[in-house]
Structures are given as structure tokens and as C-alpha cells.
């Protein structure tokens, strides 16, 4: 299998929610690696990942439930733990998830 190289100039951002965009890096059937970009004040609503999730905060500050997060932080959520992200400033995060996201109803 060949190495995959995604140029930043070729990254395709798509709207996820109001003020929240995502860019798939390596996604298959809703699982894999992607970027999430938040405008200050934007929210990713309550959801969980049946297989857990790894988050690296590239830039900005926000809250993941009651946890204050900022650039350089790494968070690993256990499988099935519901959480929401509120951006206090513009935020960029890198997410890796082994299973698709499930949004609360």
C-alpha cells in the first residue's frame, strides 16, 4: 500500500454544524481521521463514539463537557462516553475514531 499525502491546499472543508466545519483526512464508513474547525462560540452537540475517540487540540480553547481544553492538549474518550464541544475561541482539532459517531436524539 502506498503512502497517503494530503496537501493542505487540497483539503476540502465541509459544513458539519453552524460554525463547525470538518475535513476528512482518512475516512472509511464514518471512521478514521479528520480535522474539525470551530468558529468562536460554535458547538458540536452531544454525541458519542462506540469505539472511543482520540482528540488533539491543534489551536484554540474550548470546553469538552466540563473539561477546559487548549492547544497542545490530548484527550482520549472511552467508548460510549457522551460529550459536546463548545469553542471559546476559534478552535482546530484533529480527531481519530475507530467507529462512526452517534449523535444524541
Locate each region found by the language model.
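Short glycine/proline-enriched turns and hinge-like loops at secondary-structure junctions
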Residues: 48-50, 68-69, 87-89
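Ligand-binding loop in jelly-roll beta-barrel domains
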Residues: 79-104
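Conserved short histidine dyad/triad with adjacent acidic residue
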Residues: 19-21, 26-49, 76-79
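Cytosolic regulatory regions built on CNB/CRP/Popeye-like sensor folds
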Residues: 1-2, 65, 104-105
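Short acidic-glycine-tyrosine-enriched beta hairpin
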Residues: 64-84
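Glycine- and acidic-residue-biased ligand/ion/polar-headgroup-sensing regions
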Residues: 40, 49-64
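A short, N-terminal "cap"/entry segment at the start of jelly-roll beta-barrel domains
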Residues: 1-30
Amino acid at each position: 500500500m502506498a503512502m497517503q499525502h494530503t496537501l493542505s491546499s487540497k483539503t476540502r472543508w465541509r459544513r458539519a454544524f453552524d460554525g463547525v466545519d470538518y475535513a476528512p483526512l482518512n475516512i472509511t464508513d464514518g471512521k478514521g481521521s479528520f480535522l474539525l474547525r470551530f468558529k468562536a462560540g460554535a458547538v458540536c452537540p452531544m454525541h458519542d463514539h462506540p469505539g472511543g475517540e482520540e482528540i488533539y487540540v491543534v489551536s484554540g480553547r474550548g470546553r469538552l463537557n466540563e473539561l477546559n481544553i487548549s492547544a497542545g492538549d490530548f484527550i482520549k474518550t472511552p467508548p460510549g462516553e457522551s460529550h459536546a464541544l463548545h469553542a471559546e475561541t476559534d478552535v482546530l482539532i484533529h480527531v481519530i475514531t475507530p467507529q462512526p459517531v452517534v449523535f444524541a436524539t
